[in-house]
């Protein structure tokens, strides 16, 4: 009977041949808009053996390491990065970015042609008009194009944005939506079929956060000021759609229900005036009941805050999904969120948090109170950790993403 066993040398050659035949997938986020998400997705894809090239720029807010076993191609905004060394002027850097972005796209297209890449995955769009034409050129070159829709449309849309994004949705070969809500919105506004959109959730940030330490000094300072009080927090960029003012209006109501409560608000003010927010905070509660940190918060400090807070409030007026929800779950923090967009898909009512109506300070206070009734908090904390590891698991998300890659080229 013939012996079909391969020798060690033949096995090595077979493995090398298989690797040489493996597709290279190009993933693009020109501005690193979702740097934490990108790192975790690419890390998970690389761990399952996928060959990934990440086209991006240097992260603008500190250092984020490159995902292991991922080729990073920094082909975007070299001049703007260089200008950042000599000037802090936002208008100057924005002007340079506008000038060089078309050149960056030309370099990217040349790279795709030289490397014979067949699948291109956009995680974010910078210019709906320019990126639409890049997508068309990529497809003419034989590429299949995938786009991840974190939101169906921009949070603060400009005139014509919906039409521009619909053109992109109609043109790409496949769409990855992070929630069912986003999928439904794209289908309703753009006439896209359900088969063209896969729903893959937003995973937790543990793969990235595990590479950083905790700012224990900061955590100690917060805990010293808060004492043994329950810390109710808002984390993340401050923009109109996030409804922070509703949470601030709930301070007094929460104190009435939970006298030993303490409030923490941290994140950069992207829209509005920092001083106006500080004045509103001062009017809404006593200084000794509040900790604020209005800046871009590095990972070490985020981990410090997550280590001390008890409940995360997301009083959003509109939203499609939230990475902060999963980030909180991973550390056992329940989440109170409004029933807008896809947020309700991320919360198990009464188990990992509570869903409330938007614009309702009373509802926030009632939900916070329910978190601490009897032994409810302990159970919710355990459920939150379970959701992070099961429902929002990156290994599973990476497998589903790779399946989409294979599907578009089959």
Language-model features: locations:
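Acidic donor-binding loop of glycosyltransferase active sites
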Residues: 304-320, 333
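A short, well-ordered alpha-helix in the C-terminal region of glycosyltransferases
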Residues: 376-391, 400-403
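Conserved acidic donor-binding segment of nucleotide-sugar-dependent glycosyltransferases
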Residues: 349-350, 354-361, 370-375
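Short hydrophobic beta-strand element within catalytic cores of glycosyltransferases
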Residues: 328, 334-337, 347
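Acidic anion/phosphate-binding donor-loop and adjacent secondary structure
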Residues: 158, 184-188, 195-198, 203-222, ...
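Nucleotide-activated donor-binding/catalytic signature segment of Leloir-type glycosyltransferases, i.e.
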Residues: 276-303
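Conserved donor-binding/catalytic core segment of Leloir-type glycosyltransferases
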Residues: 226-242, 248-251, 263-266
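Short N-terminal targeting/anchoring amphipathic segment
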Residues: 27-28, 90-100, 108-129, 314
């Amino acid at each position: 009977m013939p012996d079909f066993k391969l020798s060690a040398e033949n096995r090595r050659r077979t493995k090398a041949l298989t690797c040489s035949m493996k597709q290279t997938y190009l993933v693009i986020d020109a501005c690193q808009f979702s740097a934490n998400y990108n790192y975790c997705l690419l890390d998970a894809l690389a761990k399952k053996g996928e060959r990934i090239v990440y086209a991006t720029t240097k992260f603008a807010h500190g250092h984020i390491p490159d995902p292991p076993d991922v080729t990073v191609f920094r082909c975007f905004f070299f001049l703007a990065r260089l200008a950042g060394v000599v000037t802090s002027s936002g208008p100057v850097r924005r002007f340079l970015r506008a000038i060089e972005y078309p050149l960056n796209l030309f370099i990217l297209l040349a790279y795709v042609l030289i490397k014979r890449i067949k699948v291109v995955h956009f995680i974010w769009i910078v210019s709906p008009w320019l990126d639409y034409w890049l997508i068309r050129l990529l497809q003419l070159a034989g590429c299949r194009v995938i786009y991840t829709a974190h939101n169906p449309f921009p949070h603060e849309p400009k005139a014509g944005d919906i039409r521009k994004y619909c053109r992109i949705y109609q043109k790409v070969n496949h769409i990855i939506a992070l929630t069912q809500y986003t999928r439904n919105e794209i289908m309703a506004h753009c006439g896209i079929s359900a088969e063209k959109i896969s729903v893959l959730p937003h995973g937790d940030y543990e793969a990235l956060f595990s590479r950083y330490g905790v700012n224990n000094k900061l955590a100690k300072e917060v805990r010293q000021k808060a004492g043994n009080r329950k810390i109710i927090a808002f984390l993340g960029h401050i923009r109109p759609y996030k409804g922070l003012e509703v949470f601030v209006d709930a301070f007094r109501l929460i104190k009435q229900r939970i006298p030993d409560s303490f409030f923490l608000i941290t994140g950069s003010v992207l829209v509005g005036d920092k001083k106006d927010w500080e004045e509103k905070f001062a009017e809404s509660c006593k200084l000794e009941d509040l900790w604020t940190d209005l800046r871009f918060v590095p990972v070490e400090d985020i981990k410090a805050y997550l280590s001390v807070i008890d409940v995360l409030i997301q009083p959003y007026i509109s939203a499609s999904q939230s990475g902060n929800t999963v980030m909180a779950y991973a550390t056992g923090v329940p989440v109170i969120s409004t029933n807008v967009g896809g947020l309700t898909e991320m919360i198990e009512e009464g188990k990992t948090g509570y869903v409330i109506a938007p614009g309702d300070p009373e509802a926030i206070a009632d939900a916070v109170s329910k978190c601490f009734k009897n032994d409810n908090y302990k159970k919710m904390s355990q459920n939150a950790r379970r959701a992070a590891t099961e429902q929002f698991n990156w290994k599973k998300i990476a497998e589903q993403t790779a399946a989409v890659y294979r599907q578009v080229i089959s």
